[in-house]
Amino acid sequence: MEVIITKGQIEDIEIIAQFQVDMAMESEGAILDKETVTNGVTAAMNDENKGLYYVAKVDGKTVGSLMLTREWSDWNNGWYWWIQSVYVAPEYRRQGIYKSMYHAVCADAKEQNVAQVRLYVDKTNIRGQKVYSS
């Protein structure tokens, strides 16, 4: 299985928004308004200062995504990149999709001399914490 990782594009907005709705329900039991989420994803797509998406594709199908936000660190005189809003379609889990996205983020971070890459996981998302620690 070949996994292709790219930065999210306008044509990915709908699937990313659906992934976010699904992720919120699975991880936090939260019901999100799809239109609001779609508008939020669109806003980030149009302004990288709000966020940047990476998507994973298998055979042309988008099977996962994550959002990257940036935080300035005066301690390190550099940027921290925060990985958040990670979602992989259930049928593609435990196949290295997240790992592929993570490696793509880290490669880009290295090219841009980012101080640290960090992963945000909600404290109530016990399942996510277990996945990321493995």
Can you name each region flagged by the protein language model?
Residues A109-Y120:
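Conserved GNAT acetyl-CoA-binding A-motif
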Residues A43-V55:
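A short helix-loop-beta-strand connector motif used in the catalytic cores of GNAT acetyltransferases and
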Residues V55, K61-R70, Y87:
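Conserved beta-strand in the GNAT
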Residues V88, R94-A107, S133-S134:
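Conserved acetyl-CoA-binding loop-helix of GNAT-fold acetyltransferases
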Residues V3-Q18:
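A short beta-loop-alpha structural element at the N-terminal edge
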Residues V21-T42:
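Conserved GNAT-fold acetyl-CoA-binding loop/helix
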Residues K99, A115, K123-S134:
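Conserved active-site alpha-helix within GNAT-family acetyltransferase domains
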